């Protein structure tokens, strides 16, 4: 399994709410409904539509995130990026190609 090779990040108190808030902002900017599902081990926030996807997943002890990729107008990209900058673990992971913004949301342990 490739899962064991993914980096793990400690989740600080309040981080789950921060990620949820940011993901909701992304979904709102994409003008798509946002779906939140929770269980004891995992918290998932996702906004999906024809314009792109924004998905965040992590468990209660460690965090492993998939790539977040969204397509929206330049002004919306600026707003989204401003909202998530403090949560992006690797600033070099942020890429913009036309109207597509790709980044990884995480926090340093």
Task: Outline where the language-model segments fall.
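DNA polymerase processivity clamps
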Residues: 2-109
